[in-house]
UniProtKB/Swiss-Prot annotation:
Keyword Coiled coil belongs to the record: yes
Biased amino acid composition, Polar residues: 35-55
Name of this protein: Uncharacterized protein At3g60930, chloroplastic
Segments passing through the bilayer: none
Ranges annotated as biased composition (Basic residues): 137-146
Compositional bias per record (Basic and acidic residues), positions renumbered to this chain: 57-79, 789-798
UniProt biased composition (Low complexity): 1-13, 462-473
Protein's organism: Arabidopsis thaliana (Mouse-ear cress)
Keywords, comma-separated and alphabetical: Chloroplast, Coiled coil, Phosphoprotein, Plastid, Transit peptide
Phosphoserine modified-residue sites: S762
Length: 798
């Protein structure tokens, strides 16, 4: 045994895997839990006890682990399994060197590999670290600097971009022009129309621009280049859905389906279109569109717009003209059209593509949609041709008729060349004289012995050559032919779906005489010879007595076969002519009905046009009347407000006049009262001085009385008599002082004038509350503290 295979070899031990070059990344081998199974050669391995039993880890497993841990793809060395752990003193020499190996079967590892918890955490940590590094690299990438047009407002389109646009969308015959740096999108040159590259790449627009789209934007007096990409997606999506569902929509439908508004915070007159409330048809638009306004170009107006719209479509930008919503006409089929358009999925990002647009336009113009195997690189070159005219019902049927005739002619050519077998006519199949019965071979065995197959018949044209080329409708039956009877009856019976036909067939087969009656005469050569021999009278002896009776019978049979072929040809021609006459009669009847329907349609259209004109006239009259009523109401409102204002002004003038009169009277009264009060105060002052004067006068009177008393006493008067006289006077004038004081007080009271009390005037000078509120800036006086209307003072004119 070699040292490499010895169980004591350290490099081959179970614990040596920890000595790998990547001790941190590669887990130890005992942590790998594997499923081990015995191999088929376990018996052979048991016969060699001296051989070790290696356990080899599969290279694909090692490669998977190395790939996850970013290790080299070198496989691990072979591992040798031991029956027990090594001894402690194994570092020197092995104690198992001379020991015999146990009998262990060779096993192999399965494809199931399990990782320990630490190994799984390491793998997750490494994956997270790699993802983090990738994210950091993306963040470190510099953002592309936005390229702006120079000068601002000019176009960034180039000849190369327009050439790519032409090549991608099949606009080879359309005249496209790159704007100059001085030209702007809102004012294209004469004879040109402004469009954006984003309208084609992001909105799937085609040329010429759909008529209904132009009518919609023109009805608001704006240009197509003034609406956003999402707005155009709404319009084109509704048109495509109408083509697919065969729903006819008009401008009135679009104006009721959609609403248009000005883009907020926009420096130019740009507008966006959104669905009306509860009328969403197209959904799933991109959350944000790429900048498209800088990539505008000019297209020749005759290539972009239909001829009948050249004088009405606006090329320069305009301002939105909005009408009242309740004045918009609502079509009769508005709800049904909405349900038909919204019946199918209408997610723009998921369900709309250039292929769907092409298929919808093909359906519109009666062209079959291409299969999925056809290349989608053949773009919309046919749009220009198909947009010009739409096939009428007669043209569609005529086209179908031409296709059928071409197909029948091709089939006849293949039949004549022998590439295909002709088809049997149903009428010829039902005729017993054309196709022999299956029992015919049993009735004429001698013909078969002669080497002539009597059941073979070639194809017979349904009509002469001149009849076939005369009219396509007359050549509807392709070929009336007699199939070989042996082909029909060999090895199978004829299947008939009709039960009555089966019963008749059985009855015919029941009796041999009836079978012989339905056979053609040329199948019986004796009968054919007798028939032709009797045509010339008694000059010809009986055919059976002729020397060449057999050849004569054969010739007569062939002759009658030719006559039968001629009869079949005449019969088929006659039946074809009869069917053609019936078809012609039905066609004439259909033509008459179509003409009647056309007349009714024209009458209905004329009535509808008259009704429409009448409706428009009524609407115009109603609109005018409504405008007049509105104007009259506004004038009445203005007149009423003017009357109220004049009444208020008159009331204010009255109040001002009354206040001025009251103020003048008050001023006069104040002046008079002031003068009177001054005089009264002067009189009062003098009256106050009257007391002093009165006292002095009393003193003077007393002095005079004393003087008179002294003089009387000196003159010889008696004191007692004088005293009595004085007492009598005191009694007579006892109330004189009281009366004097009362008189003086009454006089003072009468002379005292009250202070003037001026009547307070309003701060506004008798002005109305409404005028004061108007001056204060109050526009709405509802809910104010005004008195009730019934309690307000009357402001009627005198």
């Amino acid at each position: 045994m070699s040292s490499s295979q010895s169980p004591s070899t350290p490099s081959a031990s179970l614990v040596d895997s920890s000595d790998s070059k990547h001790p941190d990344d590669l887990p130890q081998i005992y942590k790998r839990r594997s499923v081990w199974t015995s191999s088929e050669d376990a018996v052979s391995s048991s016969n060699s006890p001296e051989q070790t039993t290696p356990f080899t880890v599969r290279e694909d497993t090692n490669a998977d682990i190395a790939r996850e841990l970013d290790l080299p793809d070198d496989p691990e060395p072979h591992l040798v399994r031991r029956s027990s752990a090594p001894m402690v003193d194994e570092a020197g020499t092995s104690n198992w060197q001379d020991a015999s190996e146990p009998l262990m079967p060779t096993v192999k590892i399965e494809d199931f590999l399990y990782f320990g918890p630490n190994e799984t955490e390491d793998i997750l940590r490494l994956n997270e670290q790699k993802a983090f590094e990738k994210a950091e690299k993306k963040k470190r990438k510099k953002k592309k600097k936005a390229v702006m047009p120079n000068p601002p407002g000019s176009s960034m389109c180039t000849e190369q971009s327009l050439s790519d646009l032409k090549a991608r969308f099949g606009l080879g015959a359309v005249t496209l022009r790159v704007p100059s740096p001085e030209e702007r999108a809102d004012s294209p040159p004469a004879g040109f129309y402004t469009l954006y590259e984003g309208f084609f790449y992001g909105c799937l627009l085609w040329l010429p621009i759909p008529r209904l789209v132009l009518e919609y934007v023109t009805s608001y007096q704006i240009a197509l280049s003034q609406i956003t990409m999402r707005s155009l997606r709404h319009l084109l999506g509704i048109l495509i859905r109408s083509y697919e569902s065969e729903t006819e929509i008009t401008l009135a439908h679009l104006r009721n389906f959609l609403e248009i508004r000005r883009v907020p915070k926009s420096e130019v007159d740009r507008y966006y279109i959104s669905p009306a409330k509860g009328k969403k048809i197209i959904d799933g638009f991109p959350s944000k569109d790429e900048p498209y306004t800088d990539h505008f170009f000019f297209v020749a107006i005759e290539d972009a717009i239909h001829e009948d719209l050249l004088g009405t479509v606006l090329t320069r930008w305009g301002i939105l003209e909005r009408t009242l919503k309740f004045l918009e006409p609502i079509p009769d089929d508005f709800l049904s059209a909405f349900h038909a358009l919204s019946a199918r999925k209408c997610d723009w990002l998921k369900h709309f593509s250039r292929e769907r647009v092409e298929c919808a336009l093909r359906l519109l113009h009666g062209v079959s949609c291409p299969t999925s195997s056809e290349s989608s690189d053949h773009r919309t070159q046919f749009f220009v041709d198909m947009q010009s005219t739409k096939l009428t019902l007669r043209e569609v049927y005529a086209k179908k008729k031409e296709d059928k005739e071409r197909r029948l002619a091709e089939e006849r050519r293949l039949v004549n060349t022998g590439l295909i077998s002709p088809r049997a006519d149903p009428e010829a199949t039902q005729d017993g004289n054309v196709i022999p019965d299956a029992t015919a071979p049993q009735t004429a065995p001698e013909a078969s012995r002669d080497g002539v197959n009597p059941y073979t018949a070639g194809p017979v044209d349904a009509a002469p050559a001149e009849a076939q080329g005369a009219e396509p409708s007359a050549a509807a039956p392709e070929a009336v032919l007699a199939l070989p009877a042996i082909d029909k009856a060999a090895g199978k019976r004829i299947r008939v779906d009709d039960v009555s036909s089966k019963k008749k067939k059985k009855k015919k087969k029941a009796s041999g005489s009836e079978v012989e009656k339905i056979l053609p005469i040329f199948e019986d050569r004796t009968a054919s010879a007798n028939l032709l021999g009797g045509c010339v009278g008694p000059l010809l002896p009986p055919p059976d007595t002729l020397l060449e009776s057999r050849k004569y019978a054969e010739t007569a049979s062939h002759f009658l076969r030719a006559v039968a072929s001629m009869n079949r040809m005449v019969h088929s021609y006659d039946s074809a002519m009869r069917s053609n006459m019936e078809v012609a009669g039905k066609l004439a009847e259909a033509e008459s009905r179509i003409q009647a329907i056309e007349r009714e349609k024209n009458e209905a259209l004329s009535e509808a046009a008259a009704a429409k004109l009448e409706k428009e006239e009524v609407e115009r009259t109603a609109h005018v009347n409504k405008e007049n009523a509105i104007k009259m109401a506004e004038q009445n409102l203005k007149a009423n407000s003017e009357i109220v204002r004049l009444k208020r002004m008159l009331s204010e003038a009255r109040g001002l006049r009354d206040s001025e009169v009251a103020r003048a009277v008050q001023t006069t009264r104040r002046e008079v009262s002031e003068t009177f009060i001054a005089k009264m105060k002067n009189a009062e002052h003098k009256v106050s001085l009257l007391d002093e004067v009165n006292d002095r006068f009393m003193y003077l009177s007393q002095a005079r009385a004393n003087a008179q008393l002294i003089e009387a006493l000196e003159g010889g008067g008696v004191l007692e008599s004088e005293k009595e006289q004085v007492d009598e006077w005191l009694k007579d004038f006892a109330d004189a002082e009281v009366n004097l004081n009362r008189f003086m007080s009454e006089l003072k009271d009468d002379l005292k004038a009250p202070a003037p009390e001026p009547a307070p005037l309003s701060p506004g000078g008798h002005r109305s509350v409404e005028s004061l509120a108007d001056e204060a800036g109050i526009t709405d006086q509802a809910g104010s503290l005004l008195p009730a209307k019934d309690n307000r003072p009357s402001e009627d004119l005198d």
